[in-house]
From Swiss-Prot:
Gene this chain is encoded by: taf2
GO MF entries: chromatin binding; transcription cis-regulatory region binding
Subcellular location: Nucleus
Ranges annotated as biased composition (Basic and acidic residues): 1163-1172
Gene3D superfamilies tied to this protein: Neutral Protease Domain 2 (1.10.390.10), tricorn interacting facor f3 domain (2.60.40.1730)
Name of the protein in question: Transcription initiation factor TFIID subunit 2
Pfam families, A to Z: TAF2_3rd (PF25316)
Domain of life: Eukaryota
Keywords: Nucleus, Transcription, Transcription regulation
InterPro entries: Aminopeptidase_N-like_N_sf, ARM-type_fold, Peptidase_M4/M1_CTD_sf, TAF2
GO CC list: transcription factor TFIID complex
Region described as Disordered: spans on this chain: 1044-1064, 1113-1191
Basic residues composition bias: residue spans: 1133-1162
Length: 1191
């Protein structure tokens, strides 16, 4: 591992956490609240440790004790409200900088936190080094908005009968939302977890269940869990509910939990989990690292699967019975991913956010190996191609994904991804889409490393990481071995070079340290004289999201004499490559042609070019570069490639290329593939849609029955009566998927009038009519849903005559038949719901298409009723998608408002996230176009949503930022009025200064600044503000401490700082109290000010601003609360502090002087207001003082 010898991991904290107790002694489902305490055992690493910073969000802190002494504390969370509510700023550049600064200010990886505890002086003033400190914190959570999710169904019965349950969730490190901790992946410790719950409930958590103790009255019981393996707080979780319990019949240390009445589904779903265990243990040659494993299936899950130490929480919707085909591979995949993350992600953690790619890469890579073993090589290669296409499309459209972001300084200027509208410095500022692509790229890069060093070495590296971690986990903390359980990029690379002896530096530099993919264009000519293939490969490396590739590239050429691999060197400026051919063109001899896999086949060579021996050419067939290839070869070459190349990726590429060649030979090649049983089913499904496109292009010359009809009839219909389908038999999954897909593809066929041919429609209606599933051992719900999708695909726009009113009577006869079928299906669903309500989902989509094509009146009412809380989640998402589409097409502000209300109030986090994602993908308007929907109220509402409305869910906040960006871009939204100009009269120098924040030009490289009216109005500086916009509401530079301010009349946030009106007794505090060592209490504020000041640095070159203007110029464009007697009275303490600080910073460089001075002025003012937090301990002054639990 790459670390300084014997130093271990360099911690950003002045102490080492060794053990933590979490005790939740009350879970109240009625009130949705929990009460408990934590106790952290820490070893100071400095003499005189006088302050401890921890992470805690939304917890109400009652008391803090350090070694049984009451300890004062300050709670400050700048992420609650990123920019103050008074701020007039509305541009995203500004928000992103402020948000990054706020997240950094409480980032545990930088040693920061929301909770700052002052160690009682009697503990550190003794002078000797403290051996150990125990920090005890009592806290409660009331109706948490993040971190813990309560599901309490609104039905009859007690909580257990209602299947009420609660579970922890979060995006990345989010444990601080439900208990105070060091919320960092690099701070490991051992754990003791206790949960007291009603006797009818079960509590599941990490580690081993040591004992379960009933209370005296037998009404409650306490579950005691011990986790002896050092684990990071973000990997700790809990779930409490009336779970049914299944001990895995194959592995007794594995236990599964599900909600009441789902046990039969659980048994079936989990019946093959042991195979996944065996597979991973075998390839890693390493035992599963924990002594037990628990799977918990919950409703309203945040994501499909989340992994924690020795347990995973899954969505209950992944459970299925043996009748279901389509869900099975999906659920298996999620289980395999969860188990891979147990090894890499939970057991082995990361040193810093920049090393996240290693863990995500390894777990994704070994999951891919499982996929290959279980579902076969074709499925695996198809998956790699899909993932590669996804990342290529994302990077070319949005911009590069950077796996290993390095930040040299604290300055935002060295932004490695200027093309993104969010910072990648923290996991909590990333868009969800970007993070998914990040994970996708990480495992693809691991595969590139495997190509370079071989799979054998790759698995040896993983084994080495695991065995080192395994040894370390059993050590006592004093041995400083625990850092071996953390992986870093450099440690991983060192391990690779030690094991394989190969230098993969260039590969890492290309794919990990920089972003972008490669874009190749290829074409060729055959030189008959020299018998040489002249290949030209060009690159586009100037477009967004691309990079230049220099290095080897493999080209495979299939000739008459066989298949030949060539490795070409892509140099700086070489485009043309000469490749010698092995075969002379000899078409007269009848001889079998050898393929790549050793097979020899007869081919009909009549289509090929008489002068050339080339059958087809492939660039980078192994996908060993992250690239997009656009290759030009003749249509007959693509047809040969489709028919005879055995690699599924090559077949997919050929199908895609043949869409551009709508000719009878293309039609024959595609039909042959459809009829080939040996061909991979996904390739055949893809060929169906390609054939439909080709048929539509050839509509005037097409002969015979509609495409695919005769094939379907031959495969699935009765011999005696070809229009009646056989009773369903889905024993062969290959033909099942084909049977589902062909009707959907056929429905895309169009005749000369661009309508779906009558023959096709009656064919689909007959399939629905004669569908018979009585003798089938599998459910046909997915098949019937696809038949409804086929009806939807057959719809074409209605021809309306002089805007007649649409009624059911005036419906076209065909459309009427479709509408009747959909209505019948929907009514049947109410009586006999299908698995996952697949039928309802398809019906809702069909109804929206009927509306969009003008057959029935456009109306969102039906969709809104299906989108209500209480319906199955898939149905809600389908209905919401329809409402979002309606909003865009009809420009409906009331529906947009309804959607945004759901985002703020819906109980299900996943649904809120999906609404914002779908709105960003299908926006009601974009920044390019004018729209009546774009108005000041909407800007304010979205700003409020991302500024403070989503502070308890990182993912949702980033979704809101995404939507804001989609609608308004980075700069000030165009629909906002320009702020009026303000004049500042400087009475000292007797001149007027134009408000310096109103600038005509923007400095390149700095975010745009909006002319927000920020003035400093203090008596000392003698400024008069003449500003029509803010007459009388001059703003005082209070610090971001106001973040925690609560609107008048609303209840305070739990644990939030309350501002008191400072009175004389505070300003005349004793000198001793003022000296309490809190000089960095507000480094979080200082940090943010530092960032914002850099943004808003005055642009007047040359002259150093005069001391008076200085205050105005360096004013950050942050929110400023109105001037009150508070800000004037806090002037008193300012002089004393100000000089003290100024002296401290004299050594700073001259040019930064005014900034620092300004910063400290704010800081000291705050400090003055805050230092009295400690006047009477423990939590008096600023924090909410509640009677302690033990009182």
């Amino acid at each position: 591992m790459n670390r300084k010898k014997d130093k271990g991991f360099e911690s950003p904290r002045p102490y080492k956490l060794t053990h933590q107790v979490v005790c939740i002694n009350n879970v109240n489902f009625q009130r949705k609240s929990v009460i408990g305490y934590v106790e952290l055992t820490i070893f100071p690493t400095v003499v005189n440790l006088n302050r401890i910073k921890l992470n805690s969000k939304q917890c109400r802190i009652y008391r803090v004790r350090v070694n049984d002494l009451e300890a004062p504390f300050i709670y400050n969370d700048p992420t609650l409200e990123v920019c103050h509510h008074e701020s007039k700023q509305r541009n995203l550049n500004y928000f992103s900088s402020a948000y990054t600064a706020a997240v950094s200010a409480v980032d545990p990886d930088a040693g920061n936190g929301e909770l700052s505890i002052k160690v009682p002086s009697e503990l550190w003033k003794q002078g000797d080094e403290m051996k150990v400190m125990k920090v005890y914190i009592e806290f409660s959570l009331d109706q948490p908005k993040g971190g813990l999710h309560f599901v309490v169904p609104d039905v009859e019965g007690n909580m257990a009968e209602r299947a009420a349950h609660v579970f922890s969730f979060g995006n990345q490190n989010s444990s601080r939302f439900w208990f105070p901790c060091v919320d960092s992946y690099s701070e490991l410790c051992t754990w003791k977890l206790e949960f007291t719950v009603d006797a009818s409930m079960v509590a599941v958590s990490c580690g081993d269940l040591v004992e379960t103790v009933y209370t005296h009255d037998m009404r409650k019981k306490t579950y005691h869990y011990m986790l002896p393996i050092p684990t990071a707080a973000p990997n700790i979780s809990m779930a409490v509910g009336p779970f049914e319990i299944l001990v895995d019949p194959y592995m007794h240390e594995v236990t599964h939990f599900c909600l009441p009445q789902l046990l039969p589904l659980l048994k079936h779903t989990m019946s093959y989990l042991h195979e996944i265990f065996e597979f991973y243990e075998e390839i890693l040659t390493c035992r599963y690292p924990y002594s037990c494993f628990k799977t918990v299936f919950v409703d309203e899950a945040y994501v499909q699967v989340s992994s924690y130490a020795s347990m995973s929480i899954f969505s209950t919707n992944l459970l299925h019975s043996g009748l279901i085909i389509d869900q099975t591979p999906m659920t298996r995949s999620f289980l395999a991913q969860a188990l891979a993350q147990q090894f890499f992600g939970c057991f082995i953690s990361r040193m810093s956010w920049a090393d996240e790619w290693v863990l995500k890469g390894i777990s994704g890579y070994i999951y891919g190996l499982y996929l290959k073993k279980t579902f076969g090589v074709n499925e695996y290669r198809h998956w790699i191609k899909e993932e590669l296409d996804k990342i290529v499309e994302y990077e070319l459209k949005i911009g590069g994904v950077l796996l290993h972001p390095t930040f040299s300084g604290g300055k935002e200027k060295d932004n490695p991804t200027p093309h993104l509208h969010f910072s990648i410095k923290h996991p909590h500022t990333l868009s969800w889409e970007y993070y998914k692509m990040f994970q996708c790229k990480a495992h693809l890069v691991m595969r590139l490393i495997e190509n370079r060093i071989s799979m054998e070495f790759m698995l040896q590296v993983f084994n080495k990481l695991l065995s080192l971690a395994s040894t370390a986990s059993s050590q006592k903390y004093q041995s400083h071995m625990w850092s071996q359980m953390l992986v870093s990029t450099s440690g991983f690379l060192k391990s690779i070079s030690n094991v394989s002896g190969k230098d993969i530096g260039p590969l890492i530099k290309q794919w990990v340290d920089q972003s972008g993919v490669v874009k190749f264009f290829g074409s060729f000519a055959f030189n008959r004289k020299r018998n040489v293939l002249e290949l030209e490969i060009r690159q586009d490396y100037t477009s967004s999201g691309t990079q230049k590739y220099v290095g080897p590239i493999k080209v495979t050429v299939q000739e008459l004499d066989g298949s030949f691999n060539h490795t070409l060197q892509i140099e700086e400026n070489s485009l043309k490559h000469d490749i010698p051919c092995h075969s002379k063109s000899r078409r007269n001899k009848k001889k079998k042609i050898p393929l790549m896999n050793g097979e020899e086949v007869d081919m009909d060579l009549s289509a090929m070019d008489a002068d050339s021996p080339l059958l087809w050419i492939r660039i980078d067939p192994d996908m060993s570069i992250l690239r997009k290839v656009e290759f030009e070869q003749a249509d007959f070459m693509w047809q040969y490639q489709l028919r005879y190349e055995r690699d599924v990726v090559a077949q997919e590429e050929a199908i895609l290329a043949l869409e551009k060649f709508p000719t009878p030979p293309s039609r024959r090649a595609l039909t042959d593939i459809l009829e080939q049983d040996q061909c991979f089913y996904k390739v055949r499904m893809h060929a169906c849609f390609c054939l439909a496109k080709i048929a539509n292009s050839m509509v005037s010359t097409w002969t015979g029955p509609p495409a695919m009809k005769s094939l379907f009839t031959r495969m699935f219909c009765c011999k005696s009566c070809p229009n009646i389908v056989k009773t369903n038999n889905f024993i062969s999954f290959q033909s099942y998927f084909l049977q589902k897909t062909i009707p959907v593809a056929m429905a895309q066929l169009r005749d000369v009038q661009n309508l779906c041919p009558r023959e096709v429609l009656s064919f689909i209606l007959d399939l629905i009519k004669y569908n018979d599933n009585r003798k089938n051992k599998f459910s046909d719900n997915y098949y019937r849903a696809e038949l409804i999708d086929a009806l939807t695909n057959s719809l074409t726009p209605a021809i309306s005559i002089n805007n007649e009113v649409r009624t059911v009577d005036s419906l076209n006869a065909d459309v009427r038949l479709i509408l009747e079928e959909i209505t019948r299906f929907l009514n049947m669903e109410k009586l006999l719901p299908s698995y996952r309500n697949t039928i309802t989902v398809s019906c809702l989509r069909a109804i929206r298409m009927l509306q969009k094509n003008g057959h029935i009146p456009s109306d969102p009412t039906l969709f809104k009723s299906y989108a209500e809380y209480g319906h199955f989640v898939d149905v809600r998402i389908a209905a919401l998608e329809a409402v979002i589409d309606y909003t865009r097409v009809d420009r409906s502000s009331s529906e947009l408002q309804w959607l945004l209300d759901l985002v703020q109030n819906d109980p299900v986090h996943y649904v809120r996230h999906e609404i914002l994602s779908m709105l960003a993908k299908n926006p009601p308007f974009t920044k390019a176009a004018d729209s009546s929907l774009c108005n000041e109220a909407l800007v304010d509402q979205l700003w409020k949503l991302m500024n403070s409305g989503t502070c308890h869910d990182w993912r949702l906040r980033c979704d809101a930022v995404n939507l804001y960006y989609t609608l308004f871009g980075l700069t000030r939204p165009s629909c906002l009025p320009l702020p009026e100009l303000g004049l500042v009269l400087n009475l000292k120098e007797k001149k007027a200064v134009l408000n310096p924040t109103i600038k005509s030009e923007q400095i390149p490289g700095l975010p745009e600044m909006t002319p927000s009216m920020t003035f400093i109005n203090t008596l000392k500086e003698e400024h008069v503000v003449m500003d029509p916009a803010l007459s009388g509401v001059a703003m005082a530079p209070l610090s971001l401490k106001r973040k925690a301010e609560t609107p008048v009349g609303s209840a305070p946030e739990p644990g939030q700082v309350l501002q008191e009106e400072p009175s004389a007794k505070i300003t005349l505090k004793s000198r001793e109290e003022e000296d309490i060592d809190m000089d960095t209490v507000h480094d979080s504020q200082a940090f943010i000010y530092h960032h914002l000041n850099m943004l808003e640095r005055p642009s007047t070159p040359g002259k150093e601003p005069s001391s008076v203007e200085q205050a105005i110029l360096s004013m950050p464009g942050t929110p400023m609360p109105t001037l009150s007697k508070e800000s004037t009275s806090s002037k008193h303490g300012e002089h004393h502090h100000h000089h003290h600080h100024h002296h401290e910073h004299k050594k700073k460089k001259k040019k930064h002087k005014h900034k620092h001075k300004h910063k400290h002025k704010h800081e000291s003012k705050d400090k003055d207001r805050d230092s009295h937090a400690f006047v009477n301990s423990p939590a008096s002054g600023l924090s909410i003082r509640s009677p302690s639990l033990s009182d």
